[in-house]
């Protein structure tokens, strides 16, 4: 099969990219052909044969005028939609595998995939791997960053709670944009065009199923890892955390739970 991997970053920038690159390596080893679409960056290590990428959006280092321009582009990215069409026409994929697309590529590319599929009478499947909770929580963490408490107020499509709580970086403006983005694409029912949503845990699947747009299309599939030969060593029992030191990762909760474990 021909598989088009879609992600905003096409270079090692975090766990999502590690997943994409490892999965792609495995797919290629099984005889499949893989190409990629995302933002242009000088550090990109994968790509597509037609050389089509969308402009890089850097919220943190952007000038004021660019931030104004980005405020529209993060909801509907016309350039991304135009550029992915070039890749679709050239590569002719059998499967488009979406990953982190929101706020940079935006779900506008799904509309172009559907249009291309219909115009060319293609049976191309669309798969969406969820690396966070963005489709059901505009700040993507299901956690209020101001109180550091878990939060599920937006579940079921109640995205106005993001604005009420200023849940995106404590900013009313950013939270408003996130709320608008969520309502816009849910009301357009663009996600009905996705065949399967892959959730990295049963918990995530349960939360995704709280929205009728996703219910019936979700599957729980744990992230994979390479197996290694176990070494027999003498050691005490311990708990290992492997990941980024960040508040939303739940390290405080892990520490508190460990305190309750028997010695």
PLM features: residue spans?
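N-terminal subdomain of nucleotide-sugar transferases
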Residues: 1-43, 89-91, 113-124, 256-259
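Charged active-site motifs of nucleotide-sugar-dependent glycosyltransferases
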Residues: 2, 217, 235-239
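Short donor-sugar binding/catalytic loops of nucleotide-sugar-dependent glycosyltransferases
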Residues: 9-11, 224, 242-246
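A conserved catalytic-core segment of Leloir-type glycosyltransferases
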Residues: 30-95
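Short N-terminal targeting/anchoring amphipathic segment
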Residues: 85-105, 124-129
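Donor nucleotide-sugar binding/catalytic pocket of nucleotide-sugar-dependent glycosyltransferases
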Residues: 125, 135, 152-230
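Conserved donor-binding/catalytic core segment of Leloir-type glycosyltransferases
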Residues: 198, 231-249, 255-260
